C-alpha cells in the first residue's frame, strides 16, 4: 500500500470565505456575530476576497482612499479577537480579475505598468500590516488566473508571482504568502517551489456538478442534472478515484516542502442537495487525508451554509441563523 503524503507546512485551517469587499455589486457588511459564530464552532480561518477598486480614487491605482483600509483593519482585528486566521486575497487586482463584470484597462500578465501597480498595492498591505504575525495574517496574491495565451500564460503567472513576492518580502520578509494554482486554481505550480510560499487549490471539479445552472455562466444551463458519482468533466465521468488522482498532483508539492490549502470549494444552490453533500464529503475525505484545510466559498449565500435559498432544504433556525444543518454538520465532521 502506497504511503499517503500529507502537507505539514500549514495548519489544517478550516473555515469560510466572507465576501465583505469582493465585488462592487455584492459586498457584505461587517458582521461581528458571524466571526463569533464561526469561531465558537471550532473553525479557525477566514479568506477575504478583496477588490482594489474599493480603495482607489478617480480610477487611479496610485490614488488611495485610506479610509477604506479601516474596514480591512476591522476584519483583521476581528480575526485576532476570535482566533481566526485572516487570509487577504485580491479577487480583483490591477490588471486582472476572473470576474469580468468590469474590464481592466491593462493586463497583469502582459503589461509592466499593471504589474508595477499590482505589486505597489501589495506593498501598501505589507507596510500597513507588517507588525501582525503570519500566524494571524497571510496574503493570497491573486485569485484564479486564467485566460487565453494572449491574456495570461503560465510563464506570465510565474513572472507576476516572483516580482510581487520580492516586492512584499522587501518590506515584510516573514509574511506568509499563498498563491493560487493556475487554470482557475486547479493546477499546481511546482516551478515556484523555490520561493517557499504556500499554494492554494480549488474544490469545484467537476464544474458541471458544482456550477449547475449558475446564472453567471451561460453554458451552465446546458449541464446535465448532476449526479455523484458520475458527473462529467473534460470528457470523463468523475468519481472518488478521479477526484483522488486530481489531488494527488497537488500533494506532490508537499514532498517539495510546500504548504497546501484549499482556498475555495462549494456547490451552487441549484444542484440537488443530496448530490451536493455526497460530492462534498468525498472532497473533504480527500483533502483531510492529506492534512489539507479548506474554506467554503461563502458563509452566507448560494454556496454557503446560511441563507443559501436551496429549494430542497428545510432550514434550521439556529442562534439566529437560517442554517443548512446537513451541510454544516458535514463541515463540522471534517
Q: Where do the protein language model's features map onto the residues?
A:
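Acidic/histidine-rich helix-loop elements
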Residues: 17-30, 58-64, 102-114, 208-242, ...
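Aromatic-rich peripheral "rim/lid" segments of glycoside hydrolase catalytic domains that contact
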Residues: 272-334
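Active-site region of glycoside hydrolase catalytic domains
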Residues: 2-5, 112-237, 245-268, 289-295
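A generic structural signal for well-ordered alpha-helical segments
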Residues: 79, 83, 253-255, 287
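Acidic-and-aromatic substrate-binding clefts and catalytic sites of carbohydrate-active enzymes
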Residues: 22-30, 54-56, 62-66, 147-148, ...
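An active-site-proximal structural segment forming one wall of the substrate-binding cleft
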Residues: 27-29, 35-46, 61-92, 96-138, ...
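Short, solvent-exposed turn/loop segments enriched in Gly/Ser/Thr/Pro and often Arg
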Residues: 49-52, 90-96, 181-183, 295-304
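N-terminal carbohydrate-binding accessory modules
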Residues: 1-47, 178, 252-253
